[in-house]
Amino acid sequence: MRRLLLLLLAFAAALPAAAPAAPPDFVQAVEFPYYLYPQTLWERELVWLKTVGIRTVEFSIPWNWHQVDGGAEFDFTGATSPRRDLLGFIRLLRRLEMRAWIRPLPPVKGWLNNGYPPGVRQDRKAARPWLHELENLLAPQTEKHGGPIAFVEGSTGINPGFPDAPAPPLPVTVVSAHDPAAMTRSRQALATAAGALLWEDVEDALFPAGWERPGGPLYRAGAVSLNGDERPTVAALRRNAALLRHWGALLPGMKPERAYPVRLAAGKLPPGVTASELVSRAPGVASAVSIVNQSRQPFQHTLRAWDPFAKHSIEIENVHLAPHETLWLPVNVSLGGAGLCRECTAFSNAEHIVYATAELQTVEFENGTLAMEFSAPAPAEAVLQLARRPSGPYLAGGHLAEFDFDEKTLRVRLKIPQGKGPASQIRVALAIEAPEHSAFFEDAKRLIIGRANTVSTSYSSEQLADRSRLRLPEGFAATPTKKSPLGIDYAVDVPADALHGDWANLAIEADGVPLGRAHLQLFRPASVHLPDGIRLHFGATADLAVEPAIIPIDATAGRTVDVNIRNNSPEIQTYAIEPSGDGFQFLPPKSELNSGAVMDRVLELRIFPDGAAPGLHDWVLRFSGGTKLEIPARFLAIPRGQAVAWSADLDGDGSPEWILENQKVRAVFSAQDGGRWLEFTWKDSAPNGLNVLPESGAFAGTGAVEVHAGDGALEFTGKDWKRTVRLAGADASLAVEQNTPLPAETLETGKHNEITLQVSRESATHAAYALVK
C-alpha cells in the first residue's frame, strides 16, 4: 500500500503532460510576425507558446522588408537587420519542433505599402519573381522535407506549387486575444470540428522604425508584454491550448450531433445559453458538449445530451457556468487507446468516462494509476464506467479524497475541486489496480543544459530494473549506475545547444512497455540579469529591456551596479565573477558567490570611472565555476551638469535611435519617421522610469532623416527642413527649434503620477518641454 501511495503521489504531482508526438490535426495557431519583435525575444516567446500548448505560428513574409532598399539584393539572414533573419527564425522553429503557417504574399497587416516594394504594381501577378526567390529559399524547409513549414496561404493561382505545402484548413476563424468574447468565439469554432483557429494580438508588437503604415501605431499591445509578463487577456488562449493538446487529434474525426440537440433535463436552455454536442464518427471514441453562457446570470442545471455509444440520452448532472463562461464537457470518452490516452492499454472497450462537469484536458495511465487533468472554474465531478473495482486511493489536487463506487453498476464518482491559475487547472489521480510491475522517476523536475544530470528511478523488482531502459529525446545521452537492487541513477547529458525553457520527455521502458514518464524543463546552468540597464518606453505602461544592457553612470562618482544571478541547478553552486572594461575600475575586481539550489543571489559591484570619456563604453562580466558565461554590456558615462548625445539600436531593428540624456532625464528620437520623438523619461521614477509621451510619441513625420550629434544637442535634417533639439545639462528642460513650423503634436501641460510635464510653445518654430518633480 505504501508503494502504491508513493506511485500515486508521484504521478498526481507530475507536470502537465506534453503534447502528443504527432501534431494535432485541428490547427490552432498564434500570429507571430517575427519582424515585429527584437530577435532577442524570439526564442523566449516561442518557448512560452510551446509550453502553453501552441505548436503552430502564423506569419507574413514582407516583400519590401527583405528586398533591401527596393534593389535586387535580398536579406534573409539578418545582415542588415537582426529582424530580417528569416532563415534563423525558421531554424528556431525546427529546433522547437513547432510548425509554420506562412503568408508569402502581400498585403501585410499594418505594414508600410502593404508589403510591396516601392514602384512595384500592387498586383499579385507582379509577385511571381518574389515567390520564385522564396521558393528557392524555403522549399527545403517544408514538412515534407523534415522542416517546420506546414501551411502556405495565398499562393494559389500564382505559383500553386510554392512551396510543397498545403493551404491551411478552411474555414479559418480569427480571434483577437483582446476580444472580450474571445473564449466564446473560439469555442464556437471548435464546436464545428472543422477549419483552423488563428489567434491575433497575443504578443506585444513593435514595428521597425519607418515600416509601420502611415498614421499607424508604432507599438501595439498584446496579451503578453515585451518583458514576457502575461496580461489577463491571455486566459482564453491558455485554456484553449490546454484543451487542444489532446482533443485536437480527435476533432477531425468528430461531427456535430444534430438529431438530438442538447437541452435541459427539464426544459429548454435559458436565454443566452447555447450548447452543442460533437460525436465521434467512429463508435466509442469520444464525444463532447460545448456549452456557452453569454447571459449575465449564473447557470446551474442538469443537461440532457446524446450518448452515441449506448444510443440513448444521458443526463449530465449539476453543470455550473458563471456568466460569460464556457465549458467543454467530455461525454463517453474511451479509456482505451482510441480516446485521449494513446497509451491506456490496460482498459477494456467497455471502460470509459461517462461524463465530467469540468473540461477534461489530459488522460494518462501508468503504474496502475489513472490521472486526469481538468480545467475546473467551479467544483465539479467526473463519472467513470469501469469493469472492476478500483483499488484506490484517490488524490485530488495533491490531497487524499474520498470517491464513490457503485458495486452494482461498477461506476465511480470523483469529486473535482475548483482549479487554480488562469486556466483553472486541477489534476486528479485514481489508483485502479496494484500494478504487477511498476517503475517511476524520483522527484525529477528539471534538467540543466550542457551538464550530466542525475535522474533517479525506482522499480518494483530487481528483475524489472535489469530489463528496463531509459527512453530519451534525440541528442540526449544517459549512463546508468545501479545504486540498489530496486534503484538506478542515470547521468543524463543534455546537449549544449538545447533551448532554455524547452521541455524534454523521458520514459522508463521494460520489454517495450512504457512504465513511467517524466516531462522535464530545460534550464541554463545560471541566468544573469542586470536590472539597472535602461529600457525603451512606449507610453507610460510598456517598455523593452535593451540588449545588451546599457547602464548610465556618473562620470565622476561612478555608481553601484546590481548583478542578479539565479542558480538554475538543483545543487549548490559557486560562481567566480570578474568584470572588466577599459576606463573603469571595479570593486571588487573579482568575486566568489555561493548560491543554493534554484536560488537567486545579488552581487553588488562598485564602478569607478578611470579616464572614461562621456558616452558609451563596452564592458563584460565573465563567469566561471558554476557556469561559464560572458555577459557583454555597456556603460553610459554622464558628467554632472552636462547632457550627453549618443546613439544605439535600442529596439533591435537595425536602425539606431538617437538619445539626449543627463542625470535626470532621457529623450529618445528615431532616425526614421521624420525624426519622431519616442520617449521623454524621468529616470528616477520607480520601477523603470516614467515616460510622459504617448505611445505614438511626438513630431512624427515620414521618411528617414540625417542626424548629427553636438554638445548636448541633436540636429535632424529632412527634406526642406532642419530641427535642433537641446537638452539642458543641469535640469530637465528640452528645447526644440525648427527652420519651418514644427509638426503638430498633442502634448499639454499636466501631471503624470509624481511628474509634471510643462509645455511652452513660444512660436510655430520654437517649443520647450520640461519635467518637474
Model-derived segments and their meaning:
Residues 91, 95-181, 197:
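Active-site region of glycoside hydrolase catalytic domains
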Residues 232-493, 497-566, 573, 586-587, ...:
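Non-catalytic C-terminal accessory domains or segments of carbohydrate-active enzymes
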Residues 184-238, 242, 288-290, 294-295:
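Aromatic/acidic polysaccharide-binding cleft in carbohydrate-active enzymes
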Residues 33, 40, 317, 518-520, ...:
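Acidic-aromatic substrate-binding/catalytic surfaces of carbohydrate-active enzymes
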Residues 18-56, 640-651:
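N-terminal carbohydrate-binding accessory modules
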Residues 42-112:
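Aromatic-lined substrate-binding rim segments of carbohydrate-active enzymes
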Residues 27-39, 64-84, 120-129, 155-160, ...:
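The substrate-binding groove and active-site-proximal loops of carbohydrate-active enzymes
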